[in-house]
């Protein structure tokens, strides 16, 4: 699944992990028009923000 297909607030991981730790789970945020990327924060640390392009492949099939 691509990051642009997720809704704001959806959880995802960057690798296919069956039972990820809190530090491996990201929350999709809003879209930054100037960078043309999506803001995403780590679940356990809201200050750990990363921006990903819309075609970034992410994984949502995990138990959390």
Predicted regions and their residues:
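Short, solvent-exposed secondary-structure boundary/capping segments
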Residues: 34-43
């Amino acid at each position: 699944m691509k990051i642009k297909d997720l809704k704001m607030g959806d959880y995802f991981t960057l690798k296919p992990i069956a039972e990820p730790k809190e530090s491996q789970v990201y929350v999709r945020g809003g879209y930054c028009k100037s960078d043309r990327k999506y803001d995403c924060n780590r679940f356990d640390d809201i200050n750990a923000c990363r921006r990903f392009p819309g075609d970034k492949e992410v994984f949502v099939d995990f138990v959390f």
